[in-house]
UniProtKB/Swiss-Prot annotation:
Pathway: Porphyrin-containing compound metabolism; chlorophyll biosynthesis (light-independent). Its main location: plastid. This is Light-independent protochlorophyllide reductase subunit N. GO terms for cellular component: chloroplast. [4Fe-4S] cluster binds at residues 23, 48, 108. It comes from Chlorella vulgaris (Green alga). Its EC number is 1.3.7.7. Protochlorophyllide reductase is composed of three subunits; ChlL, ChlN and ChlB. Forms a heterotetramer of two ChlB and two ChlN subunits. Keywords: 4Fe-4S, ATP-binding, Chlorophyll biosynthesis, Chloroplast, Iron, Iron-sulfur, Metal-binding, Nucleotide-binding, Oxidoreductase, Photosynthesis, Plastid. SUPFAM superfamilies: Helical backbone' metal receptor.
Length: 435
C-alpha cells in the first residue's frame, strides 16, 4: 500500500500549535541506566539542572551516573575557555567514575551561544583517552522522546563496521535499535529466537564495548516510533537495511513486528496467531471495561499512533490522534496497520493532527466529550476539573509497554482513571463541591 493510498483514507491535518512537551534532556533518565558503563554530562544552565533534579527525582546520595556542567555568565560572554573547563570536568569524571564513554548532552543554551562541542570532543577524547559522544538533545526538538533518538544517532558513528575475526557475524544479521529495560529486551530476543532468528545486537547496548557491528549486511529494525533520525543515520552513514515494521506495542503490533522480520529473513513464524489469541484472552477483563469507550490523544511523546491502533483493537473509539511530529516514511507500516485495524473493527478512521493547537483541541474535547483524554501533564488537571478523565502520556514512556506480555501494563494504565471514577461513583462521590 503506498503513502498516497494512505492519505486518501487516513485524514492528516497540520495545525500551528506550540510544542507542549517535556525537555528532551530527560532522556538521560533512562539512558544512563541502560548503558551501564556510561556517564552523561549535561551542559546547560541552572534551569536544566532544576529540571533534571525534579524530573528524575534522584537523591544525591544515590550518586547517579550523570551530572550538570552549569554554564555561568562568564561562559556565555566567552570570558572563560570552554575547552579547559570541560577538560577539568571530564578528568574529574574519569578519576571518580572511570566510565567507558562520556556522553555530552547539549542544551538550548549551547545551541544559542554556538558552543562547538563537536569540535572540542575529538581533541579532548585524544587527550584523556576516553570516548566522548556529543548529542544535542535540546528543547528545540518536537518531543522529549527525541532526546533518545539524538543520542542513538550519535552512537551509530561509534559502532564497529567489521566484527573481529574470531567472532564473524552471519552474512545477514539483525540489529534492533531503541532503549528498553533489560528484561523487556530479553523477552523480544526470546520471541525472535522462537521464530529461529538470532539478534546480533542492540543499540544501545548495556556496555559501550558491546556496540553492534553495523554495515551493508546488517538489517535494522526499530522498536519505538520516535527513532526516525537514528533510522536515517543507520541507512545513510552505515548502509544498513531498514525493516519497516509496525512497532511491538500490544499483541497485534508485536505479532505484526515479528511477522515482518520473519518475512525479511525468509523464516516461517511459529504459533504467532495462537500466541496472540492467548494474550487477548488474558486481557478480556480489561477489554470489557474499554469496549465502546472513546479516547482523545492530545499529543506528547510520538507513541500516539501505536497506542491508538492498540486501543482500537481493544474496542475503543479514537476521536483524534494529536502528535507533535509525524515521519510518515518511518511510521508507514504503523499507519497501514492502524488503517487495517479500523477497517476490521468497523470504526471510523481517527483524525491525525500534527503539531496540534491546544486551544483548538480543548474546544474539540468539549464538543466530543471523550471518556478519556491522554495528555501531557500541563493539561491534565484543567481537563479533570471540566469532567474529562485524563491519563498522563509521559507514563507510557516510562512503563514497560513492548512485547506480548506487557500489553497488560498498557491496559492497566488506560483503565486506571476509568476504574477510579467508577469506584468514586459507587461511593456517591461524583460531584465537585465548591468550598
Amino acid at each position: 500500500m503506498t503513502n498516497s493510498k494512505l492519505t486518501e483514507t487516513l485524514t492528516f491535518e497540520c495545525e500551528t500549535g506550540n510544542y507542549h512537551t517535556f525537555c528532551p534532556i530527560s532522556c538521560v533518565a533512562w539512558l544512563y541506566q541502560k548503558i551501564e558503563d556510561s556517564f552523561f554530562l549535561v551542559i546547560g544552565t541552572k534551569t536544566c539542572g532544576y529540571f533534571l533534579q525534579n524530573a528524575l527525582g534522584v537523591m544525591i546520595f544515590a550518586e547517579p551516573r550523570y551530572a550538570m556542567a552549569e554554564l555561568e555568565e562568564a561562559d556565555i560572554s566567552a570570558q572563560l575557555n570552554d575547552y579547559k573547563e570541560l577538560k577539568r570536568l571530564c578528568l574529574q569524571i574519569k578519576q571518580d567514575r572511570n566510565p567507558s564513554v562520556i556522553v555530552w548532552i547539549g542544551t538550548c543554551t549551547t545551541e544559542i551561544i554556538k558552543m562547538d562541542l563537536e569540535g572540542m570532543a575529538p581533541r579532548l577524547e585524544a587527550e584523556i583517552q576516553t570516548p566522548i559522544v556529543v548529542a544535542r538533545a535540546n528543547g528545540l526538538d518536537y518531543a522529549f522522546t527525541q532526546g533518545e533518538d539524538t543520542v542513538l544517532a550519535a552512537m551509530v558513528q561509534r559502532c564497529p563496521s567489521n566484527a573481529p575475526e574470531q567472532n564473524q557475524i552471519e552474512k545477514k544479521s539483525l540489529v534492533l535499535f531503541g532503549s528498553l529495560p533489560t528484561n523487556v529486551a530479553t523477552q523480544l530476543n526470546l520471541e525472535l529466537e522462537r521464530c529461529g532468528i538470532q539478534v546480533a545486537g542492540w543499540l544501545p547496548s548495556q556496555r559501550y564495548a558491546d556496540l553492534p557491528v553495523l554495515n551493508q549486511n546488517v538489517y535494522v529494525c526499530g522498536i519505538n516510533p520516535f527513532l526516525s533520525r537514528t533510522a536515517t543515520t543507520l541507512m545513510r552513514r552505515r548502509k544498513c537495511k531498514l525493516i519497516s515494521a509496525p512497532f511491538p506495542i500490544g499483541p497485534d503490533g508485536t505479532r505484526a513486528w515479528l511477522e515482518k522480520i520473519c518475512s525479511v529473513f525468509n523464516v516461517a513464524p511459529i504459533n504467532l496467531i495462537e500466541r496472540e489469541r492467548l494474550i487477548w484472552d488474558s486481557l478480556e477483563d480489561y477489554i470489557t471495561l474499554l469496549r465502546g469507550k472513546s479516547v482523545f490523544f492530545m499529543g506528547d511523546n510520538l507513541l500516539e499512533i501505536s497506542l491508538a491502533r492498540f486501543l482500537v483493537r481493544c474496542g475503543m473509539i479514537v476521536y483524534e490522534i494529536g502528535i507533535p511530529y509525524l515521519d510518515k516514511r518511518f511510521q508507514s507500516a504503523e499507519l497501514q496497520l492502524l488503517e487495517k485495524t479500523c477497517s476490521e473493527m468497523n470504526v471510523a478512521m481517527p483524525r491525525i493532527v500534527e503539531k496540534p493547537d491546544n486551544y483548538n483541541q480543548i474546544q474539540r474535547i468539549r464538543e466530543l466529550q471523550p471518556d478519556l483524554a491522554i495528555t501531557g501533564m500541563a493539561h491534565a488537571n484543567p481537563l479533570e476539573a471540566r469532567g474529562i478523565n485524563t491519563k498522563w502520556s509521559v507514563e507510557f514512556t516510562f512503563a514497560q509497554i513492548h512485547g506480548f506480555t506487557n500489553a497488560r501494563d498498557i491496559l492497566e494504565l488506560v483503565t486506571r482513571p476509568l476504574r477510579r471514577n467508577k469506584a468514586l461513583e459507587n461511593l456517591g462521590w461524583n460531584q465537585l463541591v465548591k468550598m
